[in-house]
Amino acid sequence: MTKPRKRGEAIRGFISENVENDPSKVIARTMEKFNISRQAVHQHIRHLVGQGALIHRGYGSYELRQQEEWDETISIADNPHEDVVWRNLIEPRIGKLPDNALHIWYYGLTEMFNNVVDHSESKTVSIRIKKTAYTTEMIIADYGVGIFNKIRNAMNLLDERHAVLELTKGKLTTDPKGHTGEGVFFTSRMFDTFYILSGEVFLSHTYDQEEDWILQVRENCNGTWISMKLRNNTSRTTKEIFDEFTSGDEFGFTKTVVPVRLAQYGNERLVSRSQAKRLLERIDRFKTVLFDFTEVKTIGQAFADEVFRVFANEHPQITIIPIRANVEVTQMISRARSGIEDRQGLLFDPKGQN
């Protein structure tokens, strides 16, 4: 592909992205981003309109054309096999995409649909697909017990927020004989945006952001709603995501990132050993653990000691890496680690560059 053609595709990709996210400023932003004239931007817009990717809605107003919009509720009893659902219902609606994007969609759909079949106790599942020239979005909704409620009851946890903390660690399943507990974790990392709404909890992950977001919603959502969205021309691959959470020469899911703030409730401080033990549950299943201290302003001595001295001494085979810690948290971690750091060779990167 020649350089002018690459640049033209980059410009049109930028226009498509901004038409979807903020159409009112697409022309000005494109001019600034690529240092081109207004006339040049309009030329690229006309190209996209001619391709059928954009619709002209009036003076200076454009929107992405829907290439596919499909919504269907199906019986789980009549459709128990995720690969058959993919082949007969989903792949024809998603249509032509690069192989790497199709592989991501296959993984996401089959993992999430299988979770509905095996765990939700729902009789039906609704699937919605919306595809434009730029992105494809899929929503999978069931009407069962709810994913966070299921985890809370199966593991005897405090509440649904505690269930979210466990889910974000990975390797979590309520059926260890039939599942690895990796599906939701890896699916959430593969897509541009991924969210789960269930009960009173909204969990969201965006690809280029390390941390997960969790919100308390006012109205209780029955069952579970899952949304997955991906750019059609993504360069991402499933292998790339799997490799990101594999430590060194190891094979398998051996590395995880734990958002420490999910162990907090409201404005409480992380000060106690019981809070630390809650954070450390199932961490011994990994070989490398990154504790992300984003939005954690301070931690107590007992909390730090339990994580960075007691647990570290008991599990010398696990590499513990705190990231994105502020000065106060860093100092407390250093105090807890004093005397054991040289012996265990634990890594420490408060800025998250490891």
Q: Would you name each region that the model predicts?
A:
Residues 1-110, 119-124, 235-280, 319-354:
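Bergerat-fold GHKL ATPase/HATPase_c domain
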Residues 22-23, 284-287, 316:
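Flexible coil/turn residues that form the inter-helical turn or adjacent wing/linker of helix-turn-helix
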Residues 284-299:
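Short, glycine-/small-residue-enriched flexible loop/hinge segments at domain edges that mediate gating
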Residues 220-221, 282-285:
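A structural signal for short secondary-structure junctions
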